[in-house]
Structures are given as structure tokens and as C-alpha cells.
Amino acid sequence: MRVERAFTTAGNSPYEGVAFRTATSEIRNPDGSIVFKLDEIDVPAAWSQVAVDVLAQKYFRKAGVPAALKTVTEKNVPAWLRSRRPDNKELKKLPEDKRFGGERSAKQVFDRLAGTWTYWGWKGGYFDSAADAEAFYDELRYMLATQRCAPNSPQWFNTGLHWAYGIDGPAQGHYYPDPKTGEVKKSDSAYERPQPHACFIQSVDDDLVNSGGIMDLWVREARLFKYGSGTGSNFSKLRGANEPLSGGGKSSGLMSFLKIGDRAAGAIKSGGTTRRAAKMVTVDVDHPDIEEFVSWKVVEEQKVAALVAGSKLLNRHLNDILGACHKGGLDGEARFDPQENSELKKAIKAARKVLLPENAIQQTIQFARQGYTRLEIPTYTTDWDSDAYLTVAGQNSNNSIRVSNEFLERVNDGGAWDLTTRTNDGVAKTLKARDLWDQISRAAWASADPGVQYDTTINEWHTCPVSGRINASNPCSEYMFLDDTACNLASLNLITFLNQDGSFDTERFAHSTRLWTIVLEISVMMAQYPSERIAELSYRYRTLGLGFANLGGMLMARGISYDSPEGRAIAGAITALMTGVTYAVSAEMAKELGPFAGYEPNKDEMLRVMRNHRRAAYGEKRDYEALSVRPVPLDATHCDWKDLVVASEEAWDQALELGEAHGYRNAQTTVIAPTGTIGLVMDCDTTGIEPDFALVKFKKLAGGGYFKIINRMVPRALATLGYQPEQIETIIRYAVGNGSLKNAPEINHEALKMKGFTPDVLERLEQALPSAFDIKYAFNPYTLGQDFCRDVLGVSDEKLADFELDLLAEIGFTKSQYEAANLYCCGAMTVEGAPGLKDEHLPVFDCANPCGRLGKRFLQTSSHIRMMASAQPFISGAISKTINMPGTATVEDCGDAYMEAWQLGLKAMALYRDGSKLSQPLSAIALGDDIEEDDDAVEAPLSAARVQEIAEKVARAAVERHRLPNRRKGYTQKASVGGHKVYLRTGEYAD
């Protein structure tokens, strides 16, 4: 294949014009101690500290990189492309501790990734000439360095370690298909062929112990989890509870085995691997155990609540009973007789009131008789990592229901729905479809699971139906294909293709799409796989997962609302161009290398799907072939970038024409993934297809600490909308504040000096203000000094020890004075109400959540769904996205959202209602933690507190030690600040 240059020049380094800098990356404990530090590393100058940290801490190879290398001579491989090995002769000249180390330059990483792809592409015959291969190598290195695209994490971890450094190790049980014959062979090296795939779908048969069965799946899952990949399976083949077994007896049912798999995944998660087990469990809506599956996580969350509440009640009341048995004034057996001991009677009565088991009460009295004065009863919390969640089931997977059009039509028509047995297709139970739908909606409302996958839509867009149905997805639901296949992902950073004049660089975007399609295709050839079956089918169908990130950021920069016809039209056009180009390139590769092995039997169906994609790209509203739900076609009238629309139409013309002539090299080419970690390494403001979540963020500093910044797209958007530089500065200052009280209204340096503030105290205060979420959190004994607060401000030690102390109010400032100063110093953290900002421009800055304390606006549920629907007709797979819903959303709202997603042609959707998980950080604060148990009045709930608020409140606690009562009640609250866990423990006592 020919490879053109769009970013680089032949004969020049691809890094020419890309500035680099020396940086440091470190991880610190909350106490300031350093856990990890890598200094004097070479990184692109434009990269943020977060991007540098991800690269250095996650993607740099930490060991085994030789200090001296030599090339390996290979026949017909250009000298610049030859693989490298340790130069042992040169290494022996070095001290032993200097011979091997880790990667220390971003260029090393870019070179090993791009070099490995080029090397395997050359060996596989993908390039017409060495010049084309070199152009491919240079263009990819430039795009990586300038954050235009990034592959999924396994590529960064594994790709190129053998080619670039000669790193090798014993085989780990992987397999690879011979590129020429397709014969699957067992790998004899751990590193020669990398494992670049992040997403897997695995089958499971209704068999207990044989290969391909239930227990075998846990082993196959474990092999994937161990290496950081995710997997999904459809468990609908498993018999329901009480179905007959071949050897006699009754099946224990689907749920009993799902709980085993959940435990296995949880054990691996806690076994020291780099990340949680990523797992998707899918069950068809007609399975006899579907109702229990739907409510699984709801019930388990209720168990967590019971464990938390019950353990605390046991601890409190049983120790009260124990203490009452040892109160003074009574002797002998009288102490243990509630008729004689009024304190004991009162304690027993209180315990019975909260329904403590009678035998626990009796056992405690017996314990007291033996002289014991304290019961050690473990108490649990709703922390996600706590023993409470470890105790219950269902916490190690995403759960999804497969629903068919037939089921959804019966929901709307009020019809009946049969749950069918697995062994003989008999009817296990008949219920109203609406009742089951309501159960699904209630479960999603209460616990954010299950998600919904639209089975009919998925399979009507299936390119290879002759080879089998699509039954399942990967853990994030963007990859949907045949069982026992894998997909490797990469995502293009859309903001890097937005020109300064507001136009979209269509040519370079298409060029980049072409190159990264080739990268992913080469990755299929060079990869090794965790099982023989996956190796065989991945070779046979060669599915790819190219996508994009930063759509929300790009639309904001362009001054276009996420929830607008214009925003949706642009998303549709970009997606249409991307997938059209990938299939055109796939057809080009098929011409040179042949179509994928499974193409011929699926040819007619695949071309039908291609024609439907093309119709959608041309904006057609009818004449789709074999589709029950019409897709949302491209709305060219609302897309300002007309060249983008034309390019997408031409791409689909070419994709269909070339495909009809040569077939396709790949059964699928695109998905839209969540782009979490790779979004950070590309400095994306938004991930995948998501909108932004906040306008003001905390930026990490190289030396530690954070400061507030406005989303980088906000000033760009304001300029696009016609605001002048001084207006933009005013709006930004309104949002982020001035970070100082020097010239603030009401509470400023002059006002504080009158209260006794000295220059050194004011200096300490000023240092704390730039990173403060609220000025109240800078006014604390830790910042100002305990002695100053007591001796100068006249605040007693007792008050200084109070966690809820409002020091500003204590020294005489009013609420209105505080609000004026706080807005000046810390900003509104929103642009709503900003001076000079026109109301008609507010939608451009709408985010997934309300911004700051003053923000009221946020994107509605339907805006997320409609955006997904604008892109879905042009995606081979699906879109990974969770729809955020406010805490006030109802069960009916959840059901309506799922129904709208089906009607608009989506393949899958998941919901998250704010506050629907017990483990959601700080959700308890929403009702006010100061509500006493004996309060009779019902008070209005406070607004949800943010993590930064609570974390900074800790600073109000007294720094001197105060002796507390030996026995006191309280609660423990966990938060996460800057990636560090913070535990807030309160003690409540009489004063």
C-alpha cells in the first residue's frame, strides 16, 4: 500500500518542530512521602503534568531496557527497521547496575510502538516500498507525540518490548495464527508477539466441567484478568433453577454459577493485579432466572445497607447492655437482672426497639456475667473497598439484559411474555412484559444495573450473521461481535483536527484514520491470544476498534452546544467519515492481501450493512434493508462543515464500491470506547463521545499540589462566539476567582488587619487560597496557626476543636460579606451569571452535571441519547457511554430513557442516577450529617457536598491533642482527593 505524508517530511526527523522538555513524575502519599519518582525524563513540552504522569507511571517500561543495543540482521528488512537486542559486549563495559534500566524518554515509547507496527507491517507485505514504510513510521511517531491518536493501554504496555529491546521470557500459554496459512500455533515466547487486545468476548456452554463450560470459563477469564484485559459473556445457555439435569436431580440455576464467577473475579482483583477485573455478564430477557438476575445488585446493595446499619446497631446497643451490667450501685446477680437493674432494662428495651435478635441480647448478658466489659464487634461502611462489599455478591461485573424488539413491543402493547426453559424450550413462567420492564427500570434506578442491550438492532447490523449471532459484548459494551473474538482499540483526538479558524481538517483526519486502520490491522497479525479458539476466530474475522475522543471539548471550542442539531450533525458527519474511510482502507487491503477468511459466506449480508451505512451517510430516511428500527441519518443541513459532509459521502461511495469489488479485510472497523487512560495521555478535555463534566478543574503541578483552571476550551469558545479578550478575562475570573483576598469586597486585607491579622498570617492565608474550593477552608487553625486563632482572634480551644467551626462568622463577618468575598476569590466555578455573557450562549457551556454552587444548568438525559443516536448508524460496533441522570430522576424516567434509546436505534445503553450506589463518595452528606437521632422536625436536605469541600474541611480540626471521652459515638466517611484516600472520622460527645 502507498502511504502519503501529511505531518512529516522525508529525510527529516518526525520530532522536528515538536518541542520537548525535561520533566519529573512522582506519586506521593497523603503524608507527603514519595512512593514513586522519575526525574529528568524527556517528554513533549506541550503535554500536561497529568499526561506526563500517565506515560511515566503506566506506560514507560520500568526494567529490562538495555543501556546498549545492536541491530539484528534480517533478510529484506531495511536497516533502520531492524529489531534490536542487548549488546552484551558493550554492556560488560558498564557497572552491573547501569546495564539495564527503564525507559526515560517519550521518544523511546513512540519509537517502539510505531517501529513495531511498521516492522510487522513490512514483514506482512503491507507496504509498496521502504519509502512507504518509513513514511508510516514517521507519521505515527508524530501523531503520538502531538497527541493526535493513541492505542489502547495493552499496546503501550506490551508492544515493541521484544522488537526495540530484545526483552523476552517463557511462553505464558498464548496462541497465534500463522499470518499466511491461518494455522493456530502455540507461542514459544512471552514477548515476541505482543498481546495488544483490550476487549474479549467469550462463549460459555451449559456444561459444568468440560472445555468451553462453566468452570472452564472462570479459568479463561482469569487468564485475561491477569494481563489487564476485559471480557464479556452471555450466560443464557445455562439452565434456570430447578430445570432437570441429565444425570437426575435439579439445576441450581444461573445465579448460583454467576456468584462463583463473581467471587473468582473478585479474588483476582484483590490478588495484586494492576486493575480490577473488567467483566460483563449478559442474560437474555426470556431466561427463566431473569427476574432474580435483574434484582441481583439491588438485593446485594440492600445487604450492604443491612450490614452497615446492623453492625453499628449491634456495636452500640450490645455494648450499652454490657456497660449497664457493670454500672455501680448493684451487687451480685442483681446487676444482670433487668427487673433490678433499671439501666439494663433501658438498654434491653432500646435494643429490642431496633429489632436486635433476642439471643444476641441474652448472649451479651451471659458475657457480662463472666466479667467482660467490652464487646469487639466489627462495624462496616459503604466504602466500595470495604468488607461489606467484599461480603456480598455481584460487585465484580457490569450486568446487562438482552432485550428483543418483540419484548419491547409487548411492553408497549401490554402483552404477556414467556420465560423459556433452556432444556426443552418449554414455558417456565408467563408474566406481563410491562411488569418485567418495570423491574428493570426499578433496578437501574436503585443500583445503576442492569444496562440494556438491544438484541434485534445489534444483529440486524451484524456483518457476519451466517457465522453466528452476536450474543454478548466486552465489559464497556462498545465491542459487539461473535463469541470468542477479540478487538484492539485506538482513538483519534478530535480537537487536534480543529483549525484555528474554526474549520475541521477533513483531509488530515481522513489521512490519520487511514493510517490507524492499518495499525490496528497489523496488530491483528502480530498479536498472540489467550486461547486457541480466540486466536482462530480473531484471525478469521480481524475486527478492529478505531474511534475518537474529545467530541465534547471540540464542540465547545467551536462554540456549539452539545445538545443542539448542529452538534449532533457534526458528530454524525465525523463518525460517518471515520467509518467510511476505515472500510475503504479495509477494502484496499483486501485487494492486496485478500478479504478476511469469513467474508465469502457473509458477503451478501455484509454488503447489505454497508449499503445501510451509506444510506445513513446520505441522510436517507427510508429504504433501509432488513432493519426494524430506522437509524437517525446524517443531518447535513445543520452541519456547518460542508466539506466534511461531502467527504463522508465520498468515503462511503468508495467503501461500498471497493468492497463490492474486493471484499473487506475486516469484519468490523470502528467503535466508540470510553478512552479513560488514553484520554488522559492525549490531554483530552472529554472522553469518547461524552460532554464535559465541569468547567473549572484542578490542574496538577509538577512539584505536587493543584491549582484551579478553566477548561481550556472555554476561552477558545468565547473567542469563537465573538467576545473580546478583556471580556473573556472577566468571564474566566468570574468562574475561577482571583485566588486572593487582597482587593476582595468586604473581606480583604484591610478588613482582616482590623481583626488582628499580621503580615505573616496573611501571607500563609494567601498561599492557601489559590487551591481552595471555598475561602472558609483557608480560615482554619492549621493554616492560620492555633496560637493566633486563640490568642489574637479570641477563639477558645473548645471552638477550635469543633469540626463545624465557621471561623469567619466567629470573628464577625456576615453571610453576605462571606459570599461576596468568596465569589471574588474562589469564583463561581460556572459561567452562569458571568458579567457580559449572553444568555443565548449558555448552552455552549452546559456540562453533564451542574457546575459549582451557583450552577443550575446541565445536559438532560435525552441530549445524551440523541447525541449517541447521531453517531450510532456509522459505527461498526456500539458506543460505550453511561447516561448521567440527576438524583431526582424517577423509575419511570429510567424506563423512558431505555425506551427512547431503542427507538432511536442505539445498540446498548447504561444509566447512572446520582446517589444510586451506596458507595458513591459523600452521598450521605446530601441529607445533612448534623441531623440528630432524636430530631422530630424534618429539615430540608442540603445540596450534595463535593469531595474538595469535605477534604478541605479536615483542616479545621484542632492541631493540639484533646483528651476525649473513652466512649463516644460517631461515623466514618471516606473521600478521594487527587487520587488519595481520605478517611474522616467524627466523634460525637455531650458538649
Label for each model-derived stretch:
Residues M1-D991:
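Extended catalytic cores of very large enzyme megasubunits
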